[in-house]
Swiss-Prot record:
It comes from Macaca mulatta (Rhesus macaque). This is Polyadenylate-binding protein 5. CDD domains: RRM1_I_PABPs, RRM2_I_PABPs, RRM3_I_PABPs. The keyword RNA-binding applies. NCBIfam families: PABP-1234 (TIGR01628). InterPro entries: Nucleotide-bd_a/b_plait_sf (IPR012677), PABP_1234 (IPR006515), PABP_RRM1 (IPR034364), RBD_domain_sf (IPR035979), RRM2_I_PABPs (IPR045305), RRM_dom (IPR000504), RRM_dom_euk (IPR003954). It is found in: Cytoplasm. GO terms for molecular function: mRNA 3'-UTR binding; poly(A) binding; poly(U) RNA binding. It holds the Pfam family RRM_1.
């Protein structure tokens, strides 16, 4: 329980502007220590150290609620980065409504900071441009990691800071200051950039007789290549896919446009921009999330669909092929008059298992045919 007078629930809004967030606290700091530290600034209603709900260990931050907003403002302006237990703490206005923080409006990102610039220096460097809701130099055990975030209470203040500070030299280092971007936005920009510059091409559903030389012959007409490789298993057998790296993006793009969907020796090629595994998994996750949001409730199972099944594959064999990726609740080959129709479904217990199966099994030859494996639409019953 915090020190001082408790905050009556019915009067919460009245004291909203008199509450301060206190961050970067030493684990040994208590409510009483906070109370004694801030009491000289003015009458307090209560102090609170936030703790883990299970272990009750302190989380490194807390709140100080003053009786009067003027006292809270005085403390914010004069006590920020003071010491408790030998460690400087950060102060900012308490923001119970986190919509502004989550919106990203007014938030900026700073990188290439000198290690000597701490939270205090950052605050005073940027406070000239507007009211700061929060500022934080990101650190690890070795100190500053060279980047930071400053959140202003308005977009105009953030734009002023970017205009005046981007490219400025601080302690002989030229800093970058720009608008904060959420991870999803940064990833989208990387994807857009990669699509406009890629030189590495992924090719799948190639025949067993296609080796590096034959693959090069097929792709070299579009431009000079740096490397061509058919991927093989431990026994030397082709896995049915490979990579072609061109010297220029234009050649790679032309090859994709011309060869994707083309039939070679009865096999329809897939030709596209080569993606890193983490990018493929992220794309699968995004697609799954879009499908999941269409459902009213979370389904108990995650289906994947398999096409181009060999005629010899039955339910048992299908489950066996996919069992290494996780817990399977259902594996079914679609039948017609006792004959497999060439496609089936496998239901996993989690999205992670299903995603891994798609990533590893799509294009793999099982029996005599390369599989076409995709995430299915989540349903109430799998």
């Amino acid at each position: 329980m915090g020190s001082g007078e408790p905050n009556p629930a019915g009067k919460k809004k009245k004291y909203l502007k008199a509450a301060l967030y206190v961050g970067d606290l030493d684990p040994d700091v208590t409510e009483d220590m906070l109370y004694k530290k801030f009491r000289p600034a003015g009458p307090l209603r209560f102090t609170r150290i936030c703790r883990d709900p299970v272990t009750r260990s302190p989380l490194g931050y807390g709140y100080v609620n003053f009786r009067f907003p003027a006292d809270a403002e005085w403390a914010l302006n004069t006590m920020n980065f003071d010491l408790i237990n030998g460690k400087p703490f950060r102060l900012m206005w308490s923001q119970p409504d986190d919509r502004l923080r989550k919106s990203g409006v007014g938030n900026i990102f700073i990188k290439n900071l000198d290690k000597s610039i701490d939270n205090r220096a950052l605050f005073y460097l940027f406070s000239a441009f507007g009211n700061i809701l929060s500022c934080k130099v990101v650190c690890d055990d070795n100190g500053s990691k060279g980047y930071a975030y400053v959140h202003f209470d308005s977009l105009a203040a953030a734009n002023r800071a970017i205009w005046h500070m981007n490219g400025v030299r601080l302690n002989n280092r030229q800093v970058y200051v720009g608008r904060f971007k959420f991870p999803e936005e940064r990833a989208a920009e990387v994807r857009t950039r990669d699509r406009a510059t890629f030189t590495n091409v992924f090719v799948k559903n190639i025949g067993d007789d296609i080796d590096d030389e034959k693959l090069k012959e097929l792709f070299c007409e579009y431009g000079p290549t740096e490397s061509v490789k058919v991927i093989r298993d431990a026994s030397g057998k082709s896995k049915g896919f490979g990579f072609v790296r061109y010297e220029t993006h234009e050649a790679a793009q032309k090859a994709v446009l011309d060869l994707h969907g083309k039939s070679i020796d009865g096999k329809v090629l897939y030709v596209g921009r080569a993606q890193k595994k983490i990018e493929r998994l992220a794309e699968l996750r995004r697609r799954f999330e879009r499908l999941r949001l269409k459902e009213k409730s979370r389904p108990p199972g995650v289906p994947i669909y398999i096409k181009n099944l060999d005629e010899t594959i039955n339910d048992e064999k299908l489950k066996e092929e996919f069992s290494s990726f996780g817990s399977i609740s259902r594996a079914k080959v679609m039948m017609e008059v006792g004959q497999g129709k060439g496609f089936g479904v496998v239901c996993f217990s989690s999205f992670e298992e299903a995603t891994k199966a798609v990533d590893e099994m799509n294009g793999r030859v099982v029996g005599s045919k390369p599989l076409h494996v995709t995430l299915g639409q989540a349903r109430r019953r799998c």
